[in-house]
From Swiss-Prot:
Its cofactor is Mg(2+). One of its GO terms (molecular function) is structural constituent of cytoskeleton. Tubulin is the major constituent of microtubules, a cylinder consisting of laterally associated linear protofilaments composed of alpha- and beta-tubulin heterodimers. Microtubules grow by the addition of GTP-tubulin dimers to the microtubule end, where a stabilizing cap forms. Below the cap, tubulin dimers are in GDP-bound state, owing to GTPase activity of alpha-tubulin. The gene is TUB2. This is Tubulin beta chain. It comes from the Eukaryota. Belongs to the tubulin family. It is found in: Cytoplasm, Cytoskeleton. PROSITE patterns: TUBULIN, TUBULIN_B_AUTOREG. GTP binds at Q11, E69, S138, G142, T143, G144, N204, N226.
């Protein structure tokens, strides 16, 4: 089987990761102790991608749980799915990173990284044919951002030909935990551009907006946000976990989605979004799902696709849906909004259909878009970074851990390059495209 090893790092990464395992265990009929209690052969056909079958007939996630302080790990162990994970795969320090990227990347994280890589290698050895890794982390803190990107570069070194995809939670000024988030995020994006193959960008601001606007929650907590993220993660990985046709492997998804290697940051969305408890009062058609899915209100990244252009799009539909309906609806969206799709990538929208609907829904659609409008997100972080960096505010926390100002300048200019690359391809025409191909 083509296995995927899942790594969750830092508090946010671990909380999002646990919600992901909760969601997909439900879909594969695996209970809290790892026993199979499902009813369909489809649930088990590709279960080995994410789970290892132990001799006791117990399914164990191929997951490594990492943090620089023990608190998060204790919470996972005491949570509903705490017994599911292999005890040896919890790797944690005692000191914490104090929201400092340099501590996660260069000092505290560097001390723990060898123990983490030992566990990763052990997991890789128990795989038949490893296809790659997925990492859940946030970009605003110390451990998920700093140590998460250190882990990324170590995996890239040790497994140069495997795919690495990240689910990265991007900080937002409206929902800010710490004042140095723009530094941590810019330094992380600098690493993601170079070392990740695919990055699904998830944005707290967009998640909060969804909770208020669509789900009508008055006081959403992290549990609500993580639930939304797990819906998207479950949708994005559907093709990897169940028998299907399109994008059945991480590499195939990348080949369809990434026209230029640096532009691998995706906007994700999910439909239907319904307030808790109202699902059972409504049924959806393929056309409604398609409409919702392309609506910026359903995007989990705070940028408006209408302000940019789609380079590529992948859509995963789930449930008892006819392929013909899906193709018709997707063609209609393209013809109605042709100006939003670049014309120099001819068949840039791909769709997949999986019979197995997510728990509690009759049908759903997950959206993955490679759109130039994601530069809004990077611009937001870059502007905040610049304001602080010009005054060298808070820099002593980073230089005190041995970092050099030069590294900040490099990260800043890499971010600016990324912005101008997105802009260049947004403005490009068919004639320009011929030049890109020649170069």
């Amino acid at each position: 089987m083509r296995e995927i090893i899942h790594l969750q790092t830092g508090q946010c990464g671990n909380q999002v990761g646990c919600k992901f395992w909760e969601t997909i265990s439900g879909e594969h009929g695996i209970d809290q102790s790892g026993r199979y209690v499902g009813t369909s052969d489809n649930q088990l056909e590709r279960v080995n991608v994410y789970y290892n079958e132990a001799s006791s007939k117990k399914y164990v996630p191929r997951a490594v749980l990492i943090d620089l302080e023990p608190g998060t790990m204790d919470a996972v162990r005491q949570g509903p799915f705490g017994e599911l994970f292999r005890p040896d795969n919890f790797v944690f320090g005692q000191s914490g990173a104090g929201n400092n990227w340099a501590k996660g990347h260069y000092t505290e994280g560097a001390e723990l990284i060898d123990s983490v890589m030992d566990v990763v290698r052990k997991e890789a050895e128990s795989s038949d044919c490893l296809q790659g890794f997925q990492i859940t982390h946030s970009l605003g803190g110390g451990t998920g951002a700093g140590m998460g990107t250190l882990l990324l570069s170590k995996i890239r070194e040790d497994f140069p030909d495997r795919m690495i995809c990240t689910f990265s939670v991007v900080p937002s000024p409206k929902v800010s935990d710490t004042v140095v988030e723009p530094y941590n995020a810019t330094l992380s994006i600098h690493q993601l551009v170079e070392n990740a193959d695919e990055t699904f960008c998830i944005d707290n601001e967009a998640l909060y907006d969804m909770c208020f606007r669509t789900l009508k929650l008055n006081n959403p907590g992290y549990g609500d946000l993580n639930h939304l993220v797990s819906l998207v993660m479950s949708g994005v990985t559907t093709c990897l976990r169940f028998p299907g046709q399109l994008n059945a492997y991480l590499r195939k998804l990348a080949v369809n989605m990434i026209p230029f290697p640096r532009l691998h940051f995706f906007v994700v969305g999910f439909a239907p979004l319904t307030a808790v408890g109202t699902q059972k009062f409504k049924t959806y058609s393929v056309s409604e799902l398609t409409q919702q899915m392309f609506d910026s209100k359903n995007m989990m990244t705070a940028c408006d696709p209408k302000k940019g252009r789609y380079l590529t799009v992948a859509a995963m539909f789930r449930g008892k849906i006819s392929m013909k309906d899906v193709d018709e609806q997707m063609s209609m969206v393209q013809s109605k909004n042709s100006s939003l799709f670049v014309e120099w990538i001819p068949s840039n929208v791909k769709t997949a259909v999986c019979d197995i609907a997510p728990t509690g829904l009759e049908m759903s659609a997950t959206f993955v878009g490679n759109t130039t409008s994601i530069q809004e997100l990077f611009k937001r972080i870059s502007d905040q970074f610049t304001v602080m960096f010009r005054r060298k505010a808070f820099l002593h926390w980073y230089t005190g851990e041995g970092m050099d100002e030069m590294e900040f300048s490099e990260a800043e200019s890499n971010m600016n390059d990324l912005l101008s690359e997105y802009q260049q391809y947004q403005d490009a025409t068919v004639e320009d495209a011929e030049e890109f191909l020649v170069n």
